[in-house]
């Protein structure tokens, strides 16, 4: 076994576990928004359509952010994409707790959507794919993908 193969083998398991945990947390939080739709809408007296629009905007920002964070990862390294994405996601979630109008909620969901793009499948699976050997790549990508799909 060459030195590069040994290095790849030694980092494979932590990368797979770390990437899977990022995806698990990322998409578990994202999926929980639906649980809070009715309580938040009734608490603030918003129509449910306003909260639904915020989630739709989040999905749109996630889609727009995917190629941006992919390019960021290629140019500056995946670590920076993940760090920036995690910061945006965390800041967006914290600030969303203080949103008192539908417009502020919708605006903050743009930040959350970009955060999801930076910590989502595109960036994380690229890191795991590079860390895995040719023989283990399909299994590793399957495990990580399953972690992100609740």
Regions found by a protein language model. Give the residues of each.
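MFS transmembrane alpha-helix packing/gate-lining sites
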Residues: 58-65, 92, 147-150
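Conserved MFS/SLC helix-loop-helix module at the cytosolic interface between two early adjacent transmembrane helices
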Residues: 64-103
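Residue-level signature of mid-helix packing/kink "hotspots" within the transmembrane helices
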Residues: 27, 31, 59-67, 119
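Helical-face signature of the major facilitator-like transporter fold
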Residues: 19-27, 59, 93, 101-114
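Extracellular/periplasmic helix-loop-helix junction of adjacent transmembrane segments
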Residues: 34-64
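Cytoplasmic helix-loop-helix junction between adjacent transmembrane helices
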Residues: 108-146
């Amino acid at each position: 076994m060459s030195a590069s193969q040994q290095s790849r083998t030694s980092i494979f398991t932590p990368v797979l576990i770390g990437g899977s945990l990022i995806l698990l947390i990322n998409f578990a939080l994202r999926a929980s928004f639906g649980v809070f739709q009715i309580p938040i809408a009734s608490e603030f007296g918003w129509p449910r359509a306003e909260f639904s629009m915020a989630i739709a905007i989040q999905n749109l920002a996630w889609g727009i952010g995917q190629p941006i964070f992919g390019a960021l990862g290629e140019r500056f390294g995946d670590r920076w994409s993940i760090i920036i994405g995690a910061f945006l996601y965390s800041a967006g979630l914290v600030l969303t707790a203080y949103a008192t109008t539908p417009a502020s909620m919708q605006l903050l969901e743009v930040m959350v959507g970009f955060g999801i793009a930076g910590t989502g499948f595109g960036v994380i699976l690229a890191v795991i794919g590079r860390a895995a050997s040719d023989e283990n790549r399909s299994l590793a990508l399957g495990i990580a993908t399953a972690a992100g799909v609740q």
